[in-house]
């Protein structure tokens, strides 16, 4: 039964555009103890996508999840599920299921009974319930452990039970509240891949909440970055990482170097000559600038190039000195101090055939990058 539903929903997902809204939050406001948590909040989540809400602690991301689930009530605004207003609908009547960080498994029940619990509450006939539970357990590769109790399972297995218990109810949307954070690094990486594969297989919309940037980049079709109850940027993982809209998003997602720049000359509509940390070079801008304007130039550590400078050699870029380097297997990460005192992070893919690759401490180097690889933003303070 659930196998047929799964195939039908996956086919439906492929036939329909991912721009078909399944969840909409319209001008939603929620506060606690007189403090606004989210205000004038608008978000559309499309059918069949894996959306991650990412942000630091206290940004409001879990509140958004709980409002969708019906575990909190809105102060104002509307929540829609497939164009139906569910703003005041109780949680048990919404076709939405939640996997919590704690998994919330019943310790006295077997794996099978934990997964079957929701169906029993709905008074689902045994002839239908049993194959649905077995199929859900097969999807998370736990059908052979159906009679075990939660304490007999690993953390990853417990998480799979929680997911099976949620998907067996055939929800339109599955909500996951930091549900990988309790796992160790290796298991978390494994579960990231398994969750994404399961989401593709089911065709269900997943809404995942996390503060872990790597998780968000790895698993998501789309990422919503939040701060102080508002959306800072909404885009694909690549857009979020490579085209951050402001310094908060840039510095929250991965490591990044932020350079001060002053416009010296306008070359054309996109290219300007600028002084970047004392080095004159050409940078690409996506907005109108004026001569003398201060800008921020952003470059990821992996976008910078380093060449050692010997006596009498002329630098093409910014001159600096290697103050620290860390070998990390595939990469060599260096901390470089520029002549003006600014510290720069550089990540280079390890090349064992290059005798000059592993730089010595205090080695004088030339730091450059490929023109147009930089992201240029208006000057602002780092969040």
Swiss-Prot record:
It catalyses: ATP + H2O + polyamine-[polyamine-binding protein]Side 1 = ADP + phosphate + polyamineSide 2 + [polyamine-binding protein]Side 1. Its EC number is 7.6.2.11. Gene3D superfamilies: 2.40.50.100, P-loop containing nucleotide triphosphate hydrolases. Residues 23-253 form the ABC transporter domain. The keyword Iron does not apply. The keyword Translocase applies. It is a peripheral membrane protein. GO terms for molecular function: ABC-type polyamine transporter activity; ATP binding; ATP hydrolysis activity. Pfam families: ABC_tran (PF00005), TOBE_2 (PF08402). Part of the ABC transporter complex PotABCD involved in spermidine/putrescine import. Responsible for energy coupling to the transport system. PANTHER family: SPERMIDINE/PUTRESCINE IMPORT ATP-BINDING PROTEIN POTA, SPERMIDINE_PUTRESCINE IMPORT ATP-BINDING PROTEIN POTA. The complex is composed of two ATP-binding proteins (PotA), two transmembrane proteins (PotB and PotC) and a solute-binding protein (PotD). Belongs to the ABC transporter superfamily. Spermidine/putrescine importer (TC 3.A.1.11.1) family. This is Spermidine/putrescine import ATP-binding protein PotA. It comes from Pectobacterium atrosepticum (strain SCRI 1043 / ATCC BAA-672) (Erwinia carotovora subsp. atroseptica). The gene is potA.
